[in-house]
């Protein structure tokens, strides 16, 4: 952008107020619109005289430097002529251009804090973040016998001691309060495991399968042909009998008894060398059942036993838990022998 009237002033190589004046359309010079007038400079200021000379000298020097640094285009050598010597190196410029920073090591810091971070430093930071952090492993505490004894005594008093009790106990056993707290947590977990094991073992002992195996099985009496349980044998009403071992129906007792598994006539079920036992006491004899007679009622809870019978069959042996299988077989055979004769008479 050129202002009118500035060309003569630039040719003289100096700035003058007349060259930069913007005159009004009327031709009056009352108002000045030059840069020097706006900034408040006048002709008497020294800066106006020195600025154009310095600017011209600097521009000429820059032009000389650019012309000297530009290499000349080499000409193609003619045939048969010797190669021309290499051109002389260009003179070094007065200042060097800034070069990019190249760190020797990836973790080397940049000397200038104002410059941006290079890619090598960023890669080093990423590699450090990718490395897994080492897991902090706490050393295991080894307790002495005295410490364990005192801790167990405190655990018997209270499973959940407060912070004051823990601090007092920690000072007594020479341990940190945190270690005492962790010990109580582990001890409570161990105590809960022991309680669960005890409860599970008690449930297994009280299960019906184990209680059934302890009591004598009632199925062992079936092949022995145990008779009706109303009259009672030597064991009386203490032995629990099955429902099919009840008193026979009138008129069909022998048939129902022979239809049971493992039961037959006394002569066939017993060997020939078997000697019948002595007759049972009088109160054990059951009257023959006629067609019009009803089955006997259950016996009374107690019987007047003689001294000989009490010595032979004590009350302790009547308990099925104390009696053995051999004793039960012998009692069943005696009972069959006792009630077999009246049924044969029918």
From Swiss-Prot:
<comment type="function">
    <text>Plays a critical role in eye formation by regulating the initial specification of retinal cells and/or their subsequent proliferation. Binds to the photoreceptor conserved element-I (PCE-1/Ret 1) in the photoreceptor cell-specific arrestin promoter.</text>
</comment>
<comment type="similarity">
    <text>Belongs to the paired homeobox family. Bicoid subfamily.</text>
</comment>
<dbReference type="GO" id="GO:0000785">
    <property type="term" value="C:chromatin"/>
</dbReference>
<feature type="short sequence motif" description="Nuclear localization signal">
    <location>
        <begin position="329"/>
        <end position="333"/>
    </location>
</feature>
<keyword id="KW-0238">DNA-binding</keyword>
<dbReference type="Pfam" id="PF00046">
    <property type="entry name" value="Homeodomain"/>
</dbReference>
<dbReference type="InterPro" id="IPR003654">
    <property type="entry name" value="OAR_dom"/>
</dbReference>
<dbReference type="GO" id="GO:0007601">
    <property type="term" value="P:visual perception"/>
</dbReference>
<keyword id="KW-0225">Disease variant</keyword>
<keyword id="KW-1013">Microphthalmia</keyword>
<dbReference type="GO" id="GO:0060173">
    <property type="term" value="P:limb development"/>
</dbReference>
<feature type="compositionally biased region" description="Low complexity">
    <location>
        <begin position="237"/>
        <end position="246"/>
    </location>
</feature>
<feature type="region of interest" description="Disordered">
    <location>
        <begin position="46"/>
        <end position="145"/>
    </location>
</feature>
<dbReference type="InterPro" id="IPR043562">
    <property type="entry name" value="RAX/RAX2"/>
</dbReference>
<feature type="compositionally biased region" description="Low complexity">
    <location>
        <begin position="207"/>
        <end position="225"/>
    </location>
</feature>
<dbReference type="InterPro" id="IPR017970">
    <property type="entry name" value="Homeobox_CS"/>
</dbReference>
<dbReference type="GO" id="GO:0007389">
    <property type="term" value="P:pattern specification process"/>
</dbReference>
<feature type="compositionally biased region" description="Pro residues">
    <location>
        <begin position="83"/>
        <end position="92"/>
    </location>
</feature>
<keyword id="KW-0371">Homeobox</keyword>
<dbReference type="GO" id="GO:0000978">
    <property type="term" value="F:RNA polymerase II cis-regulatory region sequence-specific DNA binding"/>
</dbReference>
<feature type="compositionally biased region" description="Gly residues">
    <location>
        <begin position="226"/>
        <end position="236"/>
    </location>
</feature>
<keyword id="KW-0217">Developmental protein</keyword>
<keyword id="KW-0805">Transcription regulation</keyword>
<keyword id="KW-0539">Nucleus</keyword>
<keyword id="KW-0804">Transcription</keyword>
<protein>
    <recommendedName>
        <fullName>Retinal homeobox protein Rx</fullName>
    </recommendedName>
</protein>
<feature type="short sequence motif" description="Octapeptide motif">
    <location>
        <begin position="33"/>
        <end position="40"/>
    </location>
</feature>
<dbReference type="InterPro" id="IPR001356">
    <property type="entry name" value="HD"/>
</dbReference>
<feature type="region of interest" description="Disordered">
    <location>
        <begin position="194"/>
        <end position="318"/>
    </location>
</feature>
<dbReference type="GO" id="GO:0006357">
    <property type="term" value="P:regulation of transcription by RNA polymerase II"/>
</dbReference>
<dbReference type="Pfam" id="PF03826">
    <property type="entry name" value="OAR"/>
</dbReference>
<feature type="short sequence motif" description="OAR">
    <location>
        <begin position="323"/>
        <end position="336"/>
    </location>
</feature>
<dbReference type="GO" id="GO:0045944">
    <property type="term" value="P:positive regulation of transcription by RNA polymerase II"/>
</dbReference>
<dbReference type="GO" id="GO:0021854">
    <property type="term" value="P:hypothalamus development"/>
</dbReference>
<feature type="compositionally biased region" description="Pro residues">
    <location>
        <begin position="274"/>
        <end position="304"/>
    </location>
</feature>
<dbReference type="GO" id="GO:0000981">
    <property type="term" value="F:DNA-binding transcription factor activity, RNA polymerase II-specific"/>
</dbReference>
<dbReference type="GO" id="GO:0001228">
    <property type="term" value="F:DNA-binding transcription activator activity, RNA polymerase II-specific"/>
</dbReference>
<dbReference type="GO" id="GO:0043010">
    <property type="term" value="P:camera-type eye development"/>
</dbReference>
<feature type="DNA-binding region" description="Homeobox">
    <location>
        <begin position="136"/>
        <end position="195"/>
    </location>
</feature>
<feature type="compositionally biased region" description="Basic and acidic residues">
    <location>
        <begin position="55"/>
        <end position="67"/>
    </location>
</feature>
<dbReference type="GO" id="GO:1990837">
    <property type="term" value="F:sequence-specific double-stranded DNA binding"/>
</dbReference>
<dbReference type="InterPro" id="IPR009057">
    <property type="entry name" value="Homeodomain-like_sf"/>
</dbReference>
